[in-house]
Amino acid sequence: MKTVEVRVAGPPDLPKINKLIDMAVMNWPMPTRLKRLASPILQYDLVDLGFLKVFVATFNGQVVGVAAWDIATLQVLPNEAGGLFHGLYVLPLIQGQGVGKKLMSTVFDDARCHQVNGLLIKAQRVSKNYFAHQGIQALSMDEGDYPYKYWKALA
């Protein structure tokens, strides 16, 4: 989608961001009850905007994608320290058209500007193939809260 614009999100964007997250989660291949319970937990609020850098992708003034990273907290990894890629959601109807890739590039560029040498991505099972397809390095699986983790080196 060539006319998609990416910008930093602000408080007025939160209702649209959370509606988009809800639509994306409801499209996940899992039981409806689980999706209904998971969606509110994944949504952002004003407190999140205080410590996350959130970007929105817009098309004709509508929010069609969102990505966020934790600008304050450094994640310690075996050989590196970096930030946390917090979330990536794209309107289900336009997935596969480059919106997610554009949002990720924006997050990666912003992290580089903040001299972060890499980002840890904790992926849900439904999105693990997406990050692998993007060529992002998979880390070894574990039994923790997110068994699918990826490392995007930025340095």
Report each predicted region and the residues it spans.
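Conserved active-site alpha-helix within GNAT-family acetyltransferase domains
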Residues: 113, 125-149
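Conserved GNAT-fold acetyl-CoA-binding loop/helix
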Residues: 22-44
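A short helix-loop-beta-strand connector motif used in the catalytic cores of GNAT acetyltransferases and
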Residues: 44-56, 84
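Conserved acetyl-CoA binding element of GNAT-fold acetyltransferases
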Residues: 78-92, 148
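Conserved beta-strand in the GNAT
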Residues: 56, 62-71, 84, 89
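Conserved acetyl-CoA pyrophosphate-binding loop and the N-cap/start of the following alpha-helix
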Residues: 94, 98-106
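A short beta-loop-alpha structural element at the N-terminal edge
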Residues: 4-19
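Conserved GNAT acetyl-CoA-binding A-motif
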Residues: 104, 111-124
